[in-house]
């Protein structure tokens, strides 16, 4: 794979990049050699990294082109970059050159391998205990322990309140200034512009809160007030800051200073958008309860647990914060709370210590893992006979029992394989294939979930009896659609597996003639 820089859209950013590389490259004289990448890419396996070098993911825009095997490779990267497992190199000023033959030469689809990493049974992301931690989980210690995707983005003073101190930007090297200018001109969003020497606290690890632990766009409703009116958190914070003698300020001063305990949650629609409606208890009876409406990806810092969210995959995409799942009874802490500031490294980031992902890679990992977890949970909770008695029936959606989340990853994977292998049309050998569904089975497959919801107290066998009675009462015209579909499936199965109808007799007495 060869990467070339597109210069027609962002010439200024490209020129600046080449200028910086020209100043730092030694022994380069020819104009063609200016395009040679002499830096040690931080995300390349086996390379030591230097903070002064330009990072490859900060280039203006890269486009994949077909390479000519007869030409020399420029900006040539091995196919396993950004997901190769390797020990993290330490940041040092002395970098060593690694021979080019250390790169793997076989072409591997990196996106496919990334999906395999994220959804494999051995993946740490697939462990169910990942979301059921009993020990305290703390998320961020210093930026040295963070990957670029997890570092907070530069905060614009025009959009949100407090920005980073001005002294912080004075400490940046000229190379960092050049990078920042190139990013702003080329429209690139860089999440790694913080210095590696800065200690990140609670406030710098996610977007600024407007009031307590709530972000911009949240709506509040205090139960203690005589008029339970909804108000935007921005308006509430503005009214409280304008006049300390304000009634709201006097009533809600110090509200939930020790955290807000989550009592209930539900999803609702507000102004045409899906939101979470959460009810919190401040811990004091005189303050009363609080109900809020917030976005689905809203992150919360939970006491003795760390960053949590109702939709961790959405939160990591929107805010770059890996989260656990939040549950009823969790205590959400405000910024500045001692339990939210003094913390160690996070077990969440232990998952990524052996992989160096880009922001897009990391988001894909969490999304794929979340999808795979949900699928395996649905495959494993249908009961021992459900998936085998009616192989083609869809999996129950209301099977999330409390004990199902405690199953180990290996047991989930085993059950998923068993359920998947019991499909109607086998893709392996003809000896293991099963007969396709007949007309009644197709009918039962279509209406089983509906009848299960109509009769919640009935088990699977009783539902089958009800479906059979309904099938007997149907007219031939109504059955015709299922009969034609069953014949089509049978013909296709015969074409793919001609020996599917040849039953193998056993020595059991029940099958003796």
Curated annotation (Swiss-Prot):
Q: What region holds the AXH domain?
A: 202-343
Q: Its Gene Ontology molecular function terms?
A: DNA-binding transcription factor activity, RNA polymerase II-specific; DNA-binding transcription repressor activity, RNA polymerase II-specific; RNA binding; RNA polymerase II cis-regulatory region sequence-specific DNA binding
InterPro entries from the entry? Answer: Ataxin_AXH_dom, Ataxin_AXH_dom_sf, HBP1, HMG_box_dom, HMG_box_dom_sf
Q: Which residues bind DNA?
A: 433-501
On tissue specificity, the annotation reads: Highly expressed in liver, adipose tissue, lung, brain, spleen, kidney, skeletal muscle and heart.
Identify the gene encoding this protein.
Hbp1
Quaternary structure (record): Binds TCF4. Binds RB1. Binds the second PAH repeat of SIN3A.
Protein's GO biological process: negative regulation of lipid transport; negative regulation of reactive oxygen species biosynthetic process; negative regulation of transcription by RNA polymerase II; positive regulation of potassium ion transport; regulation of DNA-templated transcription; regulation of transcription by RNA polymerase II; Wnt signaling pathway
Q: Pfam families given for it?
A: AXH, HMG_box
Q: Which domain of life is it from?
A: Eukaryota
Q: Would you tell me the protein name for this molecule?
A: HMG box-containing protein 1
Q: Keywords in UniProt for this one?
A: DNA-binding, Nucleus, Repressor, Transcription, Transcription regulation, Ubl conjugation, Wnt signaling pathway
Q: Can you supply one Gene Ontology CC term for this chain's record? A: nucleus
Region: Disordered; residue ranges are: 151-181
Give start-end positions of Basic and acidic residues composition bias: 165-181
The protein's matches in SMART domains, at most eight in alphabetical order, are given as:
AXH, HMG
Q: Where in the cell is it found?
A: Nucleus
Question: Induction of this protein: by what?
Answer: Up-regulated by insulin in differentiated cultured adipocytes.
Q: What does this protein do?
A: Transcriptional repressor that binds to the promoter region of target genes. Plays a role in the regulation of the cell cycle and of the Wnt pathway. Binds preferentially to the sequence 5'-TTCATTCATTCA-3'. Binding to the histone H1.0 promoter is enhanced by interaction with RB1. Disrupts the interaction between DNA and TCF4.
PTM characteristics? Ubiquitinated by the CTLH E3 ubiquitin-protein ligase complex, leading to subsequent proteasomal degradation.
């Amino acid at each position: 794979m060869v990467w070339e820089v597109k210069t027609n859209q962002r010439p200024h950013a490209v020129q600046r990049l080449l200028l910086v590389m020209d100043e730092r490259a030694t022994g380069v004289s020819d104009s063609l050699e200016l395009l040679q990448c002499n830096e040690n890419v931080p995300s390349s396996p086996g390379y030591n990294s230097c903070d002064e070098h330009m990072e490859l993911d900060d280039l203006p825009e890269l486009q994949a082109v077909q390479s000519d095997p007869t030409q020399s490779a420029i900006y040539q990267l091995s196919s396993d970059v950004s997901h190769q497992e390797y020990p993290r190199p330490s940041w040092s000023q002395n970098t060593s050159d690694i021979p080019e033959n250390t790169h793997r030469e076989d072409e591997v689809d990196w996106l496919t391998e990334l999906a395999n990493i994220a959804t494999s049974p051995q993946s740490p992301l697939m462990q169910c205990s990942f979301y059921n931690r009993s020990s305290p989980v703390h998320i961020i210690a210093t930026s040295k322990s963070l990957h670029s995707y997890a570092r907070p983005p530069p905060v614009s003073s025009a959009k949100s309140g407090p920005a980073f101190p001005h002294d912080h930007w004075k400490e940046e090297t000229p190379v960092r200034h050049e990078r920042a200018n190139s990013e702003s001109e080329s429209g690139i969003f860089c999440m790694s512009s913080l210095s590696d020497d800065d200690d990140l606290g609670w406030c710098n690890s996610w977007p600024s809160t407007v009031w307590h632990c709530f972000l911009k766009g949240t709506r509040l409703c205090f139960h203690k007030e005589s008029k339970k009116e909804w108000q935007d958190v921005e308006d509430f914070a503005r009214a409280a800051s304008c006049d300390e003698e304000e009634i709201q300020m006097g009533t809600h001063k110090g509200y939930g200073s020790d955290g807000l305990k989550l009592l209930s949650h539900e999803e609702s629609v507000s102004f045409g958008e899906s939101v979470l409606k959460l009810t919190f208890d401040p811990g004091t009876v005189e303050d009363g309860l609080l109900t809020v409406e917030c976005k689905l990806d809203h992150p919360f810092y939970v006491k003795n647990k760390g960053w949590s969210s109702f939709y961790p995959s959405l939160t990591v995409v929107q805010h770059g914060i890996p989260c656990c799942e939040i549950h009823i009874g969790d205590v959400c802490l405000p910024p500045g709370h001692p339990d939210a500031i003094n913390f160690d490294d996070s077990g969440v980031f232990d998952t990524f210590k052996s992989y160096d992902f880009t922001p897009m890679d990391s988001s894909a990992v969490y999304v794929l893992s979340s999808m795979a977890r949900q699928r395996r949970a649905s495959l494993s909770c249908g009961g021992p006979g459900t998936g085998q008695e009616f192989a083609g029936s869809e999996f129950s959606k209301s099977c999330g029992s409390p004990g199902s989340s405690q199953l180990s990853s290996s047991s989930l994977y085993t059950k998923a394989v068993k359920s998947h292998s019991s499909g109607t049309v086998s893709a392996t050998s003809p000896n293991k294939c099963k007969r396709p569904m007949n007309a009644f089975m197709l009918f039962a497959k279509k209406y089983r979930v509906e009848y299960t919801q109509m009769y919640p107290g009935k088990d699977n066998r009783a539902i089958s009896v009800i479906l059979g009675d309904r099938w007997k009462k149907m007219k031939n015209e109504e059955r015709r659609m299922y009969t034609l579909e069953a014949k089509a499936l049978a013909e296709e199965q015969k074409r793919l597996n001609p020996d599917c109808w040849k039953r193998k007799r056993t020595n059991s007495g029940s099958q003796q003639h």
